[in-house]
Amino acid sequence: MQKVQVHKGDTYFVPAGMVHGIGKGILVAEIQESSNVTYRVYDYDRIDKNGKKREIHFDKAVQVMDMGITPDVRQKPRMVRYYSGCSRELLCRCKYFETERVQVTKGFAFSVLDSSFQILVCLSGYGEVQTMDAEQKPMRFSKGETLFLPARLGRCLVIGETELIKVRC
């Protein structure tokens, strides 16, 4: 195991099988492939909703660990688009998801297609998501909140002054 110095705004891609942990005082948005499996090697003696220590899965975890994975998992954001009122940086893309950092000062338009849902995580500021569906009320959000946008929602518009993580699955 290696300790990695992290800074606000850093992006890391941690592939399946790579043992990892999150240090004290660090807040993360952990985006992962849709799966019901998490193997805990250590859990800081946290308790579950029934007041019992959460289960440790050391033997199962060892079976899926990939010790050959390179520790350099830091991603370099790449500007996707910059225009008046909005900038978009690609943070990470893999076969399961794509994440972007979106800085909105006026508006940001995008589509949620038939194939899958999308997620918006508000890192700072505030705003609302409007859709073309007159029956759909605008969805307001502020720092720390997450919006789930279901498949087939269609054309969306984010209005406000905000920094978002946008996840497309």
Segments the model singles out, each with a brief description of its role:
Residues M1-E55:
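Contiguous mid-protein beta-loop-alpha structural module that forms a pocket-lining wall or clamp
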Residues G17-V37, S142, A151-C169:
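Ligand-binding loop in jelly-roll beta-barrel domains
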Residues M1-F13, T131-L153:
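Short acidic-glycine-tyrosine-enriched beta hairpin
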Residues V4, T11-Y12, H20, F110-V112, ...:
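His/acidic/aromatic-lined binding-pocket segments of jelly-roll/cupin-type domains
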Residues Y39-G107, S111-D114:
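C-terminal amphipathic alpha-helical segment
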Residues V19, N36, Y96, G107, ...:
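Short, glycine-/Ser/Thr-/acidic-enriched flexible segments
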Residues G25, V104-A134, K143-G144:
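Glycine- and acidic-residue-biased ligand/ion/polar-headgroup-sensing regions
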Residues K8, A16, G25, R93-E98, ...:
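A generic structural signal for well-ordered coil/turn residues at beta-strand boundaries
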